[in-house]
Amino acid sequence: QTVQVEPPYYAGDGEYLMVDLIWTQCEPCTQCFSQDSSSFSTLPCESQYCQDLPSETCDCQYTYGYGDGSSTQGYMAXEDGSSVPNIAFGCGDNLQIDSGTTLTYLPQDAYNAVAQAFTDQINLPTVDESSSGLSTCFQEPSDGSTVQVPEISMQDGGVLNDLQNLAVSFFPTQCGAS
């Protein structure tokens, strides 16, 4: 039996949608939100998830490579306290913002600042799509002119990463459509 799970997400809540991994805050984590879950656990060597990893040792460590050549590594863990039991996921070490993950959460204040800076730079009228979760939706120019998308970068530990065309998705048919 196959069960499809689709979590409720709203782009205006601070997440960016990119690839097929689930990420969440895990220990050890410096400068993180308080966390205390009685249903969180690292996976034991005997678990099927660990057995499926291409590793010679039993440490349940993983490495995942992205299409652009970057990668992440960490350990496998499970969460049993949600409405979907036994969710296994990777706990990446020292991730600050990972623009290539399925879900990267920004605290609301941080997301608002990024969204406002982007809106200020794109210089187009916005379309109210808050009911669909699209908080940064823009009206196309009526004269058919080309939209100039602002440069977007992220500073991570002193390294400036150019995110242009890597972490921004454009869905012109979804904005303003009912």
Curated annotation (Swiss-Prot):
Q: List the keywords (alphabetical).
A: Aspartyl protease, Hydrolase, Protease, Secreted, Zymogen
Temperature and activity: Optimum temperature is 45 degrees Celsius. Thermostable up to 50 degrees Celsius. Retains 44% of the original activity after incubation for 30 days at 50 degrees Celsius.
Q: Name one Pfam family in it.
A: TAXi_N
State the Gene Ontology terms under molecular function: aspartic-type endopeptidase activity
| Main localization (coarse) | secreted
User: Which parts form a coiled-coil structure per UniProt?
Assistant: none
Where do the catalytic residues lie? D98
> One GO biological process from the UniProt record?
proteolysis
Q: Does the keyword section mention Disulfide bond?
A: no
Means of activity regulation:
Inhibited by pepstatin and by diazoacetyl-D,L-norleucine methyl ester (DAN) in the presence of Cu(2+) ions.
Please tell me which top-level EC class this enzyme sits in. hydrolase
What does the UniProt note on pH dependence state?
Optimum pH is 3.0. Retains 80% and 60% of the original activity after incubation for 30 days at pH 3.0 and pH 4.0 respectively. Unstable at pH higher than 5.0.
Localization recorded for this chain is: Secreted
* InterPro entries tied to this protein: Peptidase_aspartic_dom_sf (IPR021109), Plant_Aspart_Prot_A1 (IPR051708), TAXi_N (IPR032861)
Q: What is its EC number?
A: 3.4.23.12
- Chemical reaction(s) catalysed: Similar to pepsin, but also cleaves on either side of Asp and at Lys-|-Arg
Any one cellular-component term (Gene Ontology): extracellular region
Q: What does this protein do?
A: Extracellular proteinase found in the pitcher fluid of carnivorous plants. Digest prey for nitrogen uptake.
Per the record, the similarity remark reads: Belongs to the peptidase A1 family.
Task: Provide the protein name.
Answer: Aspartic proteinase nepenthesin-2
Q: Which organism is it from?
A: Nepenthes distillatoria
